[in-house]
C-alpha cells in the first residue's frame, strides 16, 4: 500500500538562498534567527529558554540547516540519533510566495513573473477599483494600500463597520486581499466580491496569483480578529502537478487539509478538510492518515507559522508553535506504515526577526521519513520540484518535467 503524507510548515525557511540579495533578503534565516533569539532569552513570552525540537532534530532538521547556512542552529541537539533523510532545497520559481512554493513542491515551478501592485499607497489601478464598485454595488472602498492584515483592521475596521465599504489591500506578494466583517458585511457577500475581483483581475490581464478573502470579527481596534473562514482564489497551476497525475493516472486520492486545495485552485484535489489552528490541523491530519488507503496523498499546510507569527514578526510565538508541532510529531510518526513516506518541508521563509512584514527568500528543509527510507543526507536540492519528482516516482507516475528523485 503506497501512501505519502506531506506536511508544509508554511514559511519555515532554513537560511537565505543564493539569490536572496535580489529579494532584499540576504542573511535571512527563519530557523536560525528564532533559535538565536531563544538562546538569548528574547523569546520568553508563552515559552522560555533555548529552542527545543527533539523530534525534528531526529529527522535531521539541525543538520539540514547546518548544510544550508554552515551554522548548526543554537539549542538544537547536535548529537540526535538521525532516523530520516534530510536536506535543503533552493527555489527555482521567480517569486517567494505561497503558490510558487507549493506548485514547485508538486513539480511545477513558476518560471514566469507574477504581476504585483508595487505602489505602497493608491496601490490598485482606478479602472479596476471602478469596475469592482460598479459590479459589486459597493458604496466605495477603504485601504487601497500595502499593509499587514492585522494592522489594517485596527486602522480601518471601525470605519468599515460604519460605512460597509470593504477594505482592499496588498503586499509584496502577488495578491489582492479583501477584509470584511463577517457579521456586518456578511461572509457570502465577501466571497461573492472576491469572485468578482478574481474575474476582473484575470480578464484585465493583471496576472495576480491570488485573491484572498479575509473575514474578521470584533467591534473595536485591539479586538478585531481574523476568522478561520479565509478563502483563497488562485489561478490554476500552468501544468499538471504530481497531485493531478496521481488522480488521473492511478485514480488516487489527494486529501487537502487547511488551505492546500485553494493554493492549487482545487485542481488535483479529491477531498477537502477545513481546520483552523495548529492543533486542529494536526488533529485533522491524524484522522485522515488513519483513514488513508492505497495511492493516497494527505497534504497539510500549517499556515499559522506564516500568518500568525512570521508576518507579524512574533519570534516567541513562532518558537512556541514550532515546539508544539514538535511535541505532537510522534503522534503522526506512529501512524507511518511499512511502505509509507512522510515529508516535512516549507514553501518559503518568513523570518520573524527581519525588517518589514513580508516573506523571505530562503532554502526550505526537506525531511523524509519512512521504514524504507535510508537515513542520511540528501544534500542540496536545486529545486523544490525534487519533492514532486520523488513522489511521482514513488507512485509510479509519469515523470515530472522538473526535479530529480531524491530516494
Curated annotation (Swiss-Prot):
Its cofactor is Mn(2+). Keywords: Cytoplasm, Isomerase, Manganese, Metal-binding. Mn(2+) 1 binds at residues 10, 347-348. GO terms for cellular component: cytosol. Its EC number is 5.4.2.7. Mn(2+) 2 binds at residues 306, 311, 359. Pathway: Carbohydrate degradation; 2-deoxy-D-ribose 1-phosphate degradation; D-glyceraldehyde 3-phosphate and acetaldehyde from 2-deoxy-alpha-D-ribose 1-phosphate: step 1/2. It holds the Pfam family Metalloenzyme. InterPro entries: Alkaline_phosphatase_core_sf, DeoB, Metalloenzyme, Phosphopentomutase_DeoB_cap_sf. GO terms for biological process: 2-deoxyribose 1-phosphate catabolic process; 5-phosphoribose 1-diphosphate biosynthetic process; metabolic compound salvage; nucleotide metabolic process. It catalyses: 2-deoxy-alpha-D-ribose 1-phosphate = 2-deoxy-D-ribose 5-phosphate; alpha-D-ribose 1-phosphate = D-ribose 5-phosphate. It is an enzyme of class 5 (isomerase). Its main location: cytoplasm. It is found in: Cytoplasm. Binds 2 manganese ions. CDD domains: PPM. One of its GO terms (molecular function) is magnesium ion binding. PANTHER family: PHOSPHOPENTOMUTASE. Belongs to the phosphopentomutase family. Isomerase that catalyzes the conversion of deoxy-ribose 1-phosphate (dRib-1-P) and ribose 1-phosphate (Rib-1-P) to deoxy-ribose 5-phosphate (dRib-5-P) and ribose 5-phosphate (Rib-5-P), respectively. This is Phosphopentomutase. It comes from Yersinia pestis bv. Antiqua (strain Angola).
Amino acid at each position: 500500500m503506497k501512501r505519502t503524507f506531506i506536511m508544509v510548515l508554511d514559511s519555515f525557511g532554513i537560511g537565505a538562498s543564493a539569490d536572496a540579495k535580489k529579494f532584499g533578503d540576504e542573511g535571512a534565516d527563519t530557523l536560525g534567527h528564532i533559535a538565536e533569539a531563544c538562546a538569548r532569552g528574547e523569546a520568553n513570552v508563552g515559552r522560555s529558554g533555548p529552542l527545543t525540537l527533539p523530534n525534528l532534530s531526529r529527522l535531521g532538521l539541525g543538520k539540514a540547516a547546518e548544510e544550508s547556512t554552515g551554522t548548526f542552529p543554537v539549542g538544537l541537539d547536535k548529537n540526535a540519533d538521525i532516523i530520516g533523510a534530510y536536506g535543503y532545497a533552493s527555489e527555482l520559481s521567480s517569486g517567494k510566495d505561497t503558490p510558487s512554493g507549493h506548485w514547485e513542491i508538486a513539480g511545477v515551478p513558476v518560471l514566469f513573473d507574477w504581476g504585483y501592485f508595487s505602489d505602497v499607497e493608491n496601490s490598485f489601478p482606478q479602472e479596476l477599483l471602478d469596475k469592482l464598485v460598479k459590479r459589486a454595488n459597493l458604496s466605495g472602498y477603504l485601504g487601497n494600500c500595502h499593509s499587514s492584515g492585522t494592522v489594517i483592521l485596527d486602522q480601518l475596521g471601525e470605519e468599515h463597520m460604519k460605512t460597509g465599504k470593504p477594505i482592499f489591500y496588498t503586499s509584496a506578494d502577488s495578491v489582492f486581499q479583501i477584509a470584511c466583517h463577517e457579521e456586518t458585511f456578511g461572509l457570502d457577500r465577501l466571497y461573492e466580491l472576491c469572485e468578482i475581483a478574481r474575474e476582473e483581475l484575470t480578464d484585465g490581464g493583471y496576472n495576480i496569483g491570488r485573491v484572498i478573502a479575509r473575514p474578521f470579527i470584533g467591534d473595536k481596534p485591539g479586538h478585531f480578529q481574523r476568522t478561520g473562514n479565509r478563502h483563497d482564489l488562485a489561478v490554476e497551476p500552468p501544468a499538471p502537478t504530481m497531485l493531478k497525475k496521481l488522480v488521473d493516472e492511478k485514480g488516487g486520492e489527494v486529501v487537502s487539509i487547511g488551505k492546500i486545495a485553494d493554493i492549487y485552485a482545487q485542481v488535483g484535489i479529491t477531498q477537502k478538510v477545513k481546520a483552523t489552528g495548529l492543533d486542529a490541523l494536526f488533529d485533522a491530519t491524524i484522522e485522515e492518515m488513519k483513514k488513508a488507503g492505497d495511492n493516497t496523498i494527505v497534504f497539510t499546510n500549517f499556515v499559522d507559522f506564516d500568518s500568525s507569527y512570521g508576518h507579524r514578526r512574533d519570534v516567541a510565538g513562532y518558537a512556541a508553535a514550532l515546539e508544539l508541532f514538535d511535541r505532537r510529531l510522534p503522534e503522526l510518526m506512529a501512524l507511518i506504515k511499512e511502505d509509507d513516506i512522510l515529508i516535512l518541508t516549507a514553501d518559503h521563509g518568513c523570518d520573524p526577526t527581519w525588517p518589514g512584514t513580508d516573506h523571505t527568500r530562503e532554502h526550505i528543509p526537506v525531511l523524509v521519513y519512512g521504514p524504507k527510507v535510508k537515513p542520511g543526507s540528501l544534500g542540496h536540492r536545486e529545486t523544490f520540484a525534487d519533492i514532486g519528482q520523488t513522489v511521482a516516482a514513488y507512485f509510479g507516475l509519469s515523470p515530472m518535467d522538473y526535479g530529480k528523485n531524491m530516494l
